[in-house]
């Protein structure tokens, strides 16, 4: 499992495909792809990856009913990269997402996994330069990820040629088909070769999604992931505009001077950042403990025990802990980095409100993070407001 991924119990999955592969090494992946997966921080496949990667690699159409937070982005990214011929620098996989932010997130994952394959992946999204899209696509890319309108436009202009597309991936299909995207998505489908494999991911199965599966999918493998209902109810969510990355530490120290917190969890996106912040806070005379994916299990147990008993007041970690940490005293969660994928947000800040306790989440936001902040608000139908000056009274 990667630090940035939550997992689900295998009993929560139903499928008409029985084979389960519990190690990335046993999936028959290209060596360069494996290097990219492990380099990204993944250790073992999540439950959905154990079941879905193989049927996709084998060429089956796959219909996965899965909420965010189950590892589905990595599932289709790994599968697409395995089936791409990196020597042919033309679009071979087409991934459609409902928002620009999600498209960018997927692009980052594809590029990270495909680093050693020398994969070119372009995000083709509205609100950006059409001329730049044309230039990049004509220079040659292996994977296109984007929003329906712009992708449809590029196909209409005959810039994006679909004749070599092997795999078509529709993420958050229910969200797109319930909005204004139905017509462009249908039009895109009709431009694809008959042999194109379709992978469709959807949290729910409304009539619009079932209509697409009936029209465009051939005997799909079905994977249903039931997911715990999580809520942001009871969690007060704030952000601090830190402007740039280098100011975060100073802001954190200032914050700790104004509040009195029994315990807090601080989330960072990388192991390196956890190590840096641990050292910096220790040198500033804070009592902190930390753990991430490279921390030995025995050491993790010691650290968690110290945190549970209160002998450690600040725990710094990656998304390794974004699920399953039963620490009742945690009243404050600080996202030193906004999560790199939206689904981990609810698992991170859900720490604060467990067992009916109220909690506060404070997000450090750089000038580059405002798009992601808006995306989190949209995705969770919530409001994240600027931190008030009387924050100490709210914790």
Curated annotation (Swiss-Prot):
Motif (DEAD box) on chain: 171-174
Catalysed conversion reaction: ATP + H2O = ADP + phosphate + H(+)
Superkingdom, natural source: Eukaryota
Motif Q motif: positions: 22-50
Catalytic activity, EC: 3.6.4.13
Residue intervals of the Helicase C-terminal domain: 234-395
Family, as annotated: Belongs to the DEAD box helicase family. eIF4A subfamily.
Record's protein name: ATP-dependent RNA helicase eIF4A
Gene designation: TIF1
